[in-house]
Swiss-Prot record:
Keyword Signal among UniProt keywords: yes
Gene: dsbA
Chief localization: periplasm
Function: Required for disulfide bond formation in some periplasmic proteins such as PhoA or OmpA. Acts by transferring its disulfide bond to other proteins and is reduced in the process. DsbA is reoxidized by DsbB. It is required for pilus biogenesis.
Residue ranges of every copy of the Thioredoxin domain listed in the record: 20-158
Protein name: Thiol:disulfide interchange protein DsbA
Positions of disulphide bridges: C49-C52
GO-annotated biological processes: cellular response to antibiotic
Alphabetized UniProt keyword annotations: Disulfide bond, Periplasm, Redox-active center, Signal
Domain of life: Bacteria
Species: Salmonella typhimurium (strain LT2 / SGSC1412 / ATCC 700720)
Keyword Ribonucleoprotein: no
A family per Pfam: DSBA
Length: 207
């Protein structure tokens, strides 16, 4: 029993030490110009970005962050248009995914079609990925030029500009803080992901 307790105490101490070590300029950066009105937790990515693919498919960073967030905390993902020949079209397609609520259905297929099989070479190819993932073609077409999708595209572009986004993947909290992966412990993938998620939670609680 004593051994179990000591092990548990060690875990608590390790967690406390980890939380205490989160600091401005290391695991996160306070923005010089905070941006009001941004989603609580905002992640920027591109289907063309190899590191974004790693974050999503290998490290599962987004999933781990979501698990740590307090109940009711909204996490939003925006696509950027400044990477790749179909950056604009993929940003619009991501807006379609948000409008139809099919982000989880199309994320992995789009990453794989853009980076792995390289079968996305046109707007029609993007549409095919959606259809193959179970989205009705008519629903996709109706959403593509809709007011809602146009607004979501503008929203993504404005957020990237307002936050002076330099590259992806990138995550911001409350429009005030940017996560700094370069300051994370990279001794193992699990430790890195855990610290990343802990840092986001710390900043959400900090407000």
């Amino acid at each position: 029993m004593k051994k179990i307790w000591l092990a548990l105490a060690g875990m608590v101490l390790a967690f406390s030490a980890s939380a205490a070590q989160i600091s401005d300029g290391k695991q996160y950066i306070t923005l010089d110009k905070p941006v009001a009105g941004e989603p609580q937790v905002l992640e920027f990515f591109s289907f063309y970005c190899p590191h974004c693919y790693q974050f999503e498919e290998v490290l599962h960073v987004s999933d781990n962050v979501k698990k740590k967030l307090p109940e009711g905390t909204k996490m939003t993902k925006y696509h950027v248009e400044f990477l790749g020949p179909l950056g604009k079209e993929l940003t619009q397609a991501w807006a379609v995914a948000m409008a139809l609520g099919v982000e989880d259905k199309v994320t992995v297929p789009l990453f794989e079609a853009v980076q792995k099989t390289q079968t996305v070479q046109s707007a029609a190819d993007i549409r095919k990925v959606f259809v193959d993932a179970g989205v009705k073609g008519e629903d996709y077409d109706a959403a593509w030029n809709s007011f809602v999708v146009k607004s979501l595209v503008a929203q993504q572009e404005k957020a990237a500009a307002d936050l002076q986004l330099q590259g992806v993947p990138a995550m911001f909290v409350n429009g005030k803080y940017q996560i700094n992966p370069q300051g994370m412990d990279t001794s193992s993938m699990d430790v890195f992901v855990q610290q990343y998620a802990d840092t986001v939670k710390y900043l959400v609680d900090k407000k």
